[in-house]
Amino acid sequence: MTEFSKTPLLDTIRTPEDLRKLRIDQVRQVADELRLETIDAVSVTGGHFGAGLGVVELTTALHYVFDTPRDRLIWDVGHQAYPHKILTGRRDRIRTLRTGGGLSGFTKRTESDHDPFGAGHSSTSISAGLGMAVASELAGKKNNVIAVIGDGSISAGMAYEAMNNAGAMNSRLIVILNDNNMSIAPPVGAMSAYLSRLYSGKTYRSLREAGKQIGKHLPKLIADRAARAEEYSRGFMMGGGTLFEELGFYYVGPVDGHNLDHLLPILQNVRDADTGPFLIHVVTQKGKGYGPAEAAADKYHAVVKFDIATGAQAKAKSNAPSYQNVFGQSLVKEAQKDDKIVGITAAMPSGTGIDIFEKAFPKRTFDVGIAEQHAVTFAAGLATEGYKPFCAIYSTFLQRAYDQIVHDVAIQKLPVRFAIDRAGLVGADGATHAGSFDNAYLGCLPNMVIMAAADEAELVHMVATQVAIDDRPSAVRYPRGEGRGVEMPEVGIPLEIGKGRVIRQGNKVALLSFGTRLAEAEKAADELATLGLSTTVADARFMKPLDVELVLKLARDHEVLLTIEEGSIGGFGSHVMQTLAEHGMLDGEVKMRALVLPDVFMDHDNPVAMYARAGLDAKAIVKKVFDVLGKDAATETSKLA
């Protein structure tokens, strides 16, 4: 610990039970110390930052008022849960966040009983919370379920589906809307806090319930008008609550999420209520309590290691452009020649490179929010009118729009262009964000063109290829992070559809790569050459349509054929095996194996370590070749020593 973050009261807290023994004035001090500890920890590890600082008081209040983990506390997405982890027995490991063997950057059921539901993706908390609340009622228990969801996450359709269901069931669910963007622009202050306490209190709820019961015995027209008048009066005084009231929630707020004098009595009132569901609208500030993060919330949403005194982040020197920037720049160049090109993102403009496109073509850029399903069908609609939509979405988030890809795009052969970022393993964000499955879930669909960029130069050409494909949907996948530092083309040149390329020619072993594992395949070929095994290295470029001619030639001309991909079982390697089987090539002498990600959800680590563990680095490729040949790589190497 540094002088900056001495935490005498926090040092006495091992579990929330310790927190609940303190006086209210001490709770305020705990919150201050918790903020200092969060700042200090993230300065060491990096990670999501601004959102966690914004919920320090809320986190402290929730654990003080509710009996966690008996009361279930669910954090939507989970990236704001670092303060929660510190208060729930994980402080001693908080400086292992997002490192191999360390704490997850999100909530995780296997990590603590205080994480009743794991997360990573958005907008799941209310559905999960409702399930827990109903389970509690069915079991005859009376514990509270609290779902904390941000104003960005609550915009997704799944959240509204859950609220609609919860309101109709009158379940004892508590939803806390963490509004840190002021998107609803509510009044915040003493009067709002007073009214929130009033409306969360027993007297108001009892009167309201009595009114509902009386309304059941009134003529329908009068009852409807009375209910409408009550909703309008609440909307006039409180602002922002009418929608949630229509969904069947008791709306409480807006409340200053940094004022414990306001938060604690409201949470206590709601805790002691006999009815539900409740929605408490809490207004917070991202980066609260740390000047640089308050001044630039976007830059401090997620950080690398940084200097606490200055806020300067220790970013490594770049040796090559990032794939997302190459995509964005390539799309701009193509759009300068074609006014039908438009860019679409689902709340990730900077993460996908669409922000680069937006600066050049703001009117042709569409950020639809956390709404991947809508993004895909919106793109499909644009395609029907002759536009060329590029839908840039992370591989892991594209999973959320699978039915739209099938039903709205592929069946109709609409030329939507998918730019699939974060393909393969993503390191510190772990299993919830890994792009492991798109090869498999897209490869089984008719009418798709599927490409993977082996390096940043290939990505430029593949963007140009997508522009030229106007009779069916297409997808190009590429990983997180920097490219290889290869020479970049001035302009993209459309590739021949369904044709791969041979990088180097050999005659004993063939390594057929799909994606950026090509670099490791080349390293493996160098090693195999020193061991006397002449090795061909090929870049498939396309998974669909597959270069059948290339695949058959590699199988005929080599004793061993390995496919290598940054994807799960059922992807590129499976397509190659299917092709070989159909041509009778697996009946002969070729020894074929598919190197894929292991059939597990891999925990977070740095990408190099993860790919080594997955058996997809050069060393593992060499070992696999010798395993197939029935030899030991270490023995063969020692013979040459």
From Swiss-Prot:
Alphabetically sorted, this entry's keywords are:
Isoprene biosynthesis, Magnesium, Metal-binding, Thiamine biosynthesis, Thiamine pyrophosphate, Transferase
Q: Which InterPro entries match?
A: Dxylulose-5-P_synthase, THDP-binding, Transketo_C/PFOR_II, Transketolase-like_Pyr-bd, Transketolase_BS, Transketolase_C, Transketolase_CS
Its pathway is: Metabolic intermediate biosynthesis; 1-deoxy-D-xylulose 5-phosphate biosynthesis; 1-deoxy-D-xylulose 5-phosphate from D-glyceraldehyde 3-phosphate and pyruvate: step 1/1
PANTHER family (UniProt xref): 1-D-DEOXYXYLULOSE 5-PHOSPHATE SYNTHASE-RELATED (PTHR43322), 1-DEOXY-D-XYLULOSE-5-PHOSPHATE SYNTHASE, CHLOROPLASTIC (PTHR43322:SF5)
Summary of the function given for this chain in its UniProt record: Catalyzes the acyloin condensation reaction between C atoms 2 and 3 of pyruvate and glyceraldehyde 3-phosphate to yield 1-deoxy-D-xylulose-5-phosphate (DXP).
Binding positions for Mg(2+) per the UniProt entry = 151, 180
Q: What is this protein called?
A: 1-deoxy-D-xylulose-5-phosphate synthase
In short, the EC number is 2.2.1.7
Tell me any Pfam family this protein matches. Answer: DXP_synthase_N
* Bound cofactor: record note: Binds 1 Mg(2+) ion per subunit.
Which PROSITE patterns does its entry note?
A: TRANSKETOLASE_1, TRANSKETOLASE_2
Required co-factors: Mg(2+); thiamine diphosphate
What NCBIfam families does this protein map onto?
dxs, PRK05444.2-2
What are the recorded GO MF terms, alphabetically? 1-deoxy-D-xylulose-5-phosphate synthase activity; magnesium ion binding; thiamine pyrophosphate binding
Does the record bear Zinc-finger in its keywords?
no
The organism named in the record is Rhodopseudomonas palustris (strain TIE-1)
Give binding positions for thiamine diphosphate. 79, 120-122, 152-153, 180, 290, 372
